[in-house]
Amino acid sequence: MCRERDPQEDPASPEAGVLQVLDRQLAVGGQLVTFATAAAVYEDAFVPLHGEYQAHNALLALAAAEAVHGGRRLPARIVEDGFASVTSPGRLEVLRSSPTVLVDAGHNPHGIEALTGAIEEAFGFQHLVAVLGVMADKDAEGVLAGLEPVTDAVVCVPIDSPRAMDVDDLGEIAQEVYGADRVVVSQQLDEGVAQAVA
């Protein structure tokens, strides 16, 4: 459901002229979000992605779509259909269940903060193991420090890139953050994933 904005609304009021995520509720497979744009309020739009950051990304996409259409309110059906087809490969993407395997391309402490918040909000994991490879120019210690509070262990794996951090170097950093008993170093990605889900 959506309503058009009253042009007489005070532009300084929370209801007028700004982009806002007014409400978010967990839903199976994503979240129900109420968006406010300069043109309308869109209530309970289903966004099939997890995390507060994805609600804000969806809000920006919605505002861009309104701008393309002359700044007008979009029909509710268009908004529903548009969000229903949204995917975000590599961002808190569920690859399989039983056990659940997620993939996320977060590569800095800020991205990991968004990831861990979304994991805690959307999933009730009793046991969580991170499988991690890092580029050499990234803040590996900061990424590991962000993951450590929400994971039981970390499996360090190589990345197939000339820019990748050596997996043994990553393992040493991980041991400083997690302690040696919570770190596994695997020389192959597939073996590392198998160790994590075992």
Feature map (PLM): residue ranges:
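C-terminal helical cap/extension that packs against the catalytic core
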Residues: M1, Q8-D10, V28-T34, T100-L102, ...
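Beta-strand->loop->alpha-helix junctions that form or flank phosphate-binding loops
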Residues: M1-L26, V47-G51, I78-S85, E93, ...
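Nucleotide phosphate-binding/pyrophosphate-handling subdomain across enzymes
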Residues: V33-A153
